[in-house]
A protein has these predicted regions:
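His-Asp phosphorelay/catalytic-motif detector in bacterial-type signaling
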Residues: 45-47, 72-77
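C-terminal output helix
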Residues: 106-115
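Receiver (REC) domain active-site loop signature in two-component systems and cognate sites
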Residues: 55
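Short, glycine/charged-rich "phosphate-handling" switch motifs in NTP-dependent
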Residues: 99
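Charged docking surfaces used in two-component/phosphorelay signaling
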Residues: 15-23
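Acidic, metal-coordinating helix/loop segments flanking the phosphotransfer/catalytic sites
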Residues: 30-48, 91
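Active-site residues of response regulator receiver
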Residues: 52, 82
Length: 123
């Protein structure tokens, strides 16, 4: 299936996302913040990036902008998985290049459905 980069400063959230997507057949690599994610994205190609917004060192909006500046990630789906649900933040994410927005806490089936949809995979 897909190679997914999951970015969140919460270890429990990274574990839950990884568990959910691995059980759906995907390979998941975790990063603890935007800087860690950018380093991993430079070393390996991912089919999708799933990132929190509020993180230390580099937030998810900045990460999205930085990834979009890299040719291999210009068209890679980037989903924001966050507690932020305000319209202003969503617009900021979209302007940075985010493909979609999932609000925490998430339903595992919803996460799998959204990931499958943006990757063009059958569910």
């Amino acid at each position: 299936m897909a190679n997914i980069l999951a970015v969140d400063d919460s270890a429990s959230m990274r574990q839950m996302v990884s568990f959910t997507l691995t059980n759906a057949g995907h390979q998941v690599v975790s990063a603890v913040d935007g800087k860690d994610a950018l380093d991993k994205a430079g070393a390996e190609q991912f089919d999708l990036v799933l990132t929190d917004v509020n993180m230390p060192l580099m937030d998810g909006i900045t990460l999205t902008r930085e990834l979009r500046a890299l040719p291999p990630y210009r068209f890679t789906p980037i989903l924001m998985l966050t507690t932020e649900s305000g319209a202003d933040r969503k617009l900021e994410g979209k302007a940075a290049g985010a493909t979609g927005w999932i609000v925490k806490p998430f339903n595992p089936d919803q996460l799998i459905a959204v990931v499958s949809k943006v990757l063009g995979l059958p569910r």
